[in-house]
Every structure is written in C-alpha cells, then in structure tokens.
Swiss-Prot record:
Protein name from the UniProt record: Splicing factor 3B subunit 6-like protein
Chain ranges of the RRM domain: 19-94
Nucleus recorded as keyword: yes
Encoding gene per record: sftb-6
Region Interaction with pre-mRNA branch site, annotated ranges: 16-29
Alphabetically ordered keywords of this record: mRNA processing, mRNA splicing, Nucleus, RNA-binding
C-alpha cells in the first residue's frame, strides 16, 4: 500500500483530509497496542491516544506521519469490524472540537454567574423579591 501512496503524492487532497484521524465506536477494552496493530498496517503512526474517561471511552485519535497514509487508513478502516463493533473513522476537525469546548465553557460560566447572583427561575418571583412587582389593573 505504501507504493500506491507514493504514486499519488502529486494528487491534490480535499481540504478536510489531514494526518489526524478520529475513531469512534471502539470496544471499551481496546489497548493502544491493538490500535497500533490495526492502524500501523497503513503507514507509520506517530501517536495513538485512546479515550479512557466516561466521555471519551470508545474513541481514539491516530496521528500518522504521512497524510496519504492517513487517507488510505480512513478509506480502508471505516466500517472495519473490531470485536463486533464497526469503526467510524473520520478526519479530525479542530474547529468543531474548539467550538464544542467553547460552548461547554460558556455554559459552565453562565451557570456559575446565575448561581453567584441568584438569577434564574421564575421571573415574577424575582421581581417580587426586588419589590418591582406591580399589581395588575382590573
């Protein structure tokens, strides 16, 4: 496969293609060694990070030395069966990850501010507490 990749070096790749792959639907007990065994068949792997927290379990990042090896691995391993689980292999998109992280950070900050200043809940009760409640006309 490496020979086929070398022949395609002059080919232009789509913008979403990069050296970092994001893998989903992994078996929870998969090891880094098993990941190197699977993904190493398509080229030199620089790094593999397997998720181990509740949010990241079943996912991993694989970083290839060469972008063409990453492209080949993505094409061949999407849908690959590992322990009766079909892998979802995508190109890592940093902008999506940052947007998600920024949103979560902003939500947490907003909740902290609401808690600190006692904001939130029923608006009429808040007005009544502050003496801003006016009786309705009949």
């Amino acid at each position: 496969m490496a020979m086929a990749n070398r022949q395609n070096r002059g080919a232009k790749l789509p913008p979403e293609v990069n050296r970092i792959l994001y893998i989903k639907n992994l078996p929870y007990k998969i090891t880094t060694e098993e990941m190197y065994e699977i993904f190493g068949k398509f080229g030199a792997v620089r790094q593999i990070r397997v998720g181990n927290t509740a949010e990241t379990r079943g996912t991993a990042f694989v970083v290839y030395e060469d972008i063409f090896d990453a492209k080949t691995a993505c094409e061949h391993l999407s849908g690959y069966n590992v322990s009766n689980r079909y892998l979802v292999v995508l190109y890592y998109q940093a902008t999506k990850a940052w947007k998600r992280m920024d949103t979560e950070k902003a939500r947490t900050k907003l909740e902290d501010i609401k808690e600190r200043y006692g904001i939130g809940g029923d608006i009429d009760k808040e007005k009544e507490k502050l003496g801003l409640f006016t009786p309705r006309r009949i």
